[in-house]
Amino acid sequence: MAFGDAWKQLSWFYYQYLLVTALYMLEPWERTIFNSLLISVAAMAVYTGYVFMPQHIMAILHYFEVVQ
């Protein structure tokens, strides 16, 4: 029963996502392209944050002389 409830909840979130982004009006292939682009941009943002954030944090800490 828990799997069914979780599936209903995920379906509800996906339906809300379609409504908020107006993707329900698109063809399935257009929706796939949009979702692929969205996931690609999000993945690049996470990767960029992972790679460059430590450098920026260390520069800030050196600037405020927290770390020598």
From Swiss-Prot:
Residue spans crossing the bilayer: 10-26, 32-54
Localization (cell): Endoplasmic reticulum membrane
Topology: which residues are Lumenal? 27-31
Query: Which Gene Ontology BP annotations are present?
Result: ceramide biosynthetic process
Pfam hit, one: SPT_ssu-like
**Any single GO CC term annotated in Swiss-Prot or TrEMBL for this entry:** endoplasmic reticulum membrane
- Topology within the bilayer: Multi-pass membrane protein
Q: Which keywords are on file for this protein? A: Endoplasmic reticulum, Lipid metabolism, Membrane, Sphingolipid metabolism, Transmembrane, Transmembrane helix
| Family indicated by similarity | Belongs to the SPTSS family. SPTSSA subfamily.
Can you state the subunit structure given in the record? Component of the serine palmitoyltransferase (SPT) complex, which is composed of SPTLC1, SPTLC2 or SPTLC3 and SPTSSA or SPTSSB. The heterodimer consisting of SPTLC1 and SPTLC2/SPTLC3 forms the catalytic core of the enzyme, while SPTSSA or SPTSSB subunits determine substrate specificity. SPT also interacts with ORMDL proteins, especially ORMDL3, which negatively regulate SPT activity in the presence of ceramides.
Main function: Component of the serine palmitoyltransferase multisubunit enzyme (SPT) that catalyzes the initial and rate-limiting step in sphingolipid biosynthesis by condensing L-serine and activated acyl-CoA (most commonly palmitoyl-CoA) to form long-chain bases. The SPT complex is composed of SPTLC1, SPTLC2 or SPTLC3 and SPTSSA or SPTSSB. Within this complex, the heterodimer consisting of SPTLC1 and SPTLC2/SPTLC3 forms the catalytic core. Within the SPT complex, SPTSSA stimulates the catalytic activity and plays a role in substrate specificity, which depends upon the overall complex composition.
State what protein this is by name.
Serine palmitoyltransferase small subunit A
